[in-house]
Amino acid sequence: MRALLAAAVFILTPAAFADPAEDFAALIADYEAHEAARDVIRRGRRGDLEAASVWPDASFEAVAAHDRAMAGFLERLEAIDPDALPDDQAANYAVLAYQLESAAAIPASRAALTPFTNDSGFHTRPDFVALGTRLRTVEQAEAWIARIEALPEYFAQHRAWLERGLERRITQPRDILPGVADQIEAQIVAPEESTLFTPLAGLPDSIPDEERARLRAAALEAIETRALPALRELHAFFVEDYIPGARESLGARDLPGGAAYYRDLVRYH
């Protein structure tokens, strides 16, 4: 019996006297790793070719998994006594607490219902990414072409959230939506005029002429057969379904649960 008690004490003691500083450092490392893993745009810019060939995963499953992860991080943070941390970690604790509490108050699954404003959003992100993309190798160019080809799924994921928002009566105000539809329509241009083609227009001379021609032709085909049809479908959805079904009021307070949502917006944004 004494041996069992001794073993129990030996097992429980490390957990009972866990170092808050070590727990906090591990939490920060896990949080940063989680954020880095899901930020495929940044990873792509840093040379990760697999990340450079896809868009952020906005599927229901991925967003729900992110919300669960953030809730888990907050639970771990709340188990750490900030007064037990070194003085130089107080600011880090406060910043992380703000970020995680904000994510709990306004989870990604709520924000995903209205993933745009009157001037930008998921629908403009591909063009912004294109303008910030510099291709230096054949492999980078092929990754960008793959990313263009992935646009239908990217738009479909966000459309699914917009449809869910319509079902729940959580939409952006109708007054701003014609301008958003115009932004989408403005992207429906000839492939060679598309902002998505911009990275291919600046391919370096270090890539042989024949290869540059091949890559540009592949990009133009991807824009013609993948990006433009997806943009046309998205525009039609906005005009035919989203705008007619959107709320007429302007204030966030008028949304279901709007008073609490407005309070959280004021507090965390």
Locate each region found by the language model.
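Sec-dependent N-terminal signal peptides
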Residues: A3-L12
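N-terminal maturation segment of proteins
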Residues: A18-H269
